[in-house]
C-alpha cells in the first residue's frame, strides 16, 4: 500500500528523472538485444552451428521476451512499474554476462532464454511507467523519444562489437552487460511509482476488486477490452515477426550476401540505426500532430515497401542510402506503438493488457529468426526479408482499419 508521503515524492520534475532512467533502461535493453546479432557468426563458428540452429538462438531470445513481457505486464499492475523495471534490469544484466561463460549451443540457448525474460518485461514496464507520467498533449513525442533509447542501445552495441569482437572475441562483449546493475540500484532509490498507479492501489471498491480478480479475466469479460487485446496481439505479432526477423539477420545479410567486412558492416548499421532514432523521434511529433493511427500505418507500410527494394535493387553505390531511408521508416511504428497501445486500455489492467497483447504477438514472432534461417539455408536471407515485408504490410493495415486512438488517458486512475 502506498502512503501520502510516498505520493508526495512526485514533484513537477519527477517525470524528467523517470524519463532519464527509462531512456537508459531501454538503451541497455536494446544494446543487450543486439549483442547476439553481432556475435552470431562468431558463435556459429565456435559451436559449429547450422544456419537453422543459429536462427533458433534468436527464437529463444524472442520466446523468453514474450513470456517475460506477459508476466512483466501482470507484475507491473500488481507490484509497481518502477519495481519491475529494476528487477528486469538486474535479471538480464547478470544472466547476459553469464553467456560469456557458456560452452555449447544448449547452454547458450537456455541462459539466453532466461536472460530474455528480463528484456521482455523491461520494455512493457518502461513504457507503462512513462505513459502514466507524461501529459496526453506531449505523450507521443516523449514516448517516441523514449523509444529512441532502444536504438541508441543498438548503436552502442554496434560500436562495442566493432571494437571488441575482432581483437578480443565475442565473449568479452557479453561480459560488458553487467554494468547496468548499478543503474538499477540507483533507479530503485530515485524514481517513485507514478501517481495514477499509486491511486489505483489506494482506491477502495472497484480498484481493490481489480487487484483481487484475474486481470486477464477482466480483459476478456469486457467486449471492448477483449477486442482491443485481440487486435493488438495480431498487430504486435506481425510487427515483431518483421522487426526481429530483420533485426536478427541484417548484419549477417550485409556480411554474407553483400560481401561487407565486419567493421564496414558495423559502420553501415550505425547509419541505419541513426536514421532509426530520427524516425522514432519524428514519429512522436507526427503522431501528436497527425494522429497515432496515420503515423503508425505510414511507417509500417513504408517499411514493407522498402524491404524488397533493399533486396532487389541494392548496389555498392546506393546501399547506404537505401539503408538510411529504411532505418527511418523502420523506426516509425515503434515510435508510436507505446502511446497507441497504452491509450487503448484502462489503468487497472493496462500493464497486463499491453504486456499480454504485445507478447502474445511476440510468441508468434519468435519463429521469425528461425524462419529466415530456414529460407537462407535453401535460398537467401534476402528471400526471408521479402516475407518480413509482407508481415509489415499487414501490421500497418490492421490498426489503420480497426484500432481507434486516444481511447483512455493513462494519467487517470
From Swiss-Prot:
Pfam family, one: MFS_1
Keyword Chloroplast: no
Annotated keywords: Cell inner membrane, Cell membrane, Membrane, Transmembrane, Transmembrane helix, Transport
Spans traversing the lipid bilayer: 17-37, 54-74, 86-106, 113-133, 146-166, 172-192, 229-249, 267-287, 294-314, 319-339, 353-376, 383-403
Name assigned to this protein: Cis,cis-muconate transport protein
Disulfide bond annotation, renumbered to this chain: none
Family matches, as Gene3D superfamilies: MFS general substrate transporter like domains
Family assignment from sequence similarity: Belongs to the major facilitator superfamily. Aromatic acid:H(+) symporter (AAHS) (TC 2.A.1.15) family.
Stretches of the chain found on the membrane's Periplasmic side: 38-53, 107-112, 167-171, 250-266, 315-318, 377-382
Membrane-topology descriptor: Multi-pass membrane protein
Described purpose of this protein according to its UniProt entry: Probable uptake of muconate.
Cellular component aspect of the GO annotation: plasma membrane
Any GO MF annotation of the entry: carboxylic acid transmembrane transporter activity
PANTHER family xref list: CARBOXYLIC ACID TRANSPORTER PROTEIN HOMOLOG (PTHR23508:SF10)
Ranges facing Cytoplasmic side: 1-16, 75-85, 134-145, 193-228, 288-293, 340-352, 404-413
Keyword Cell inner membrane: yes
Places the protein is found: Cell inner membrane
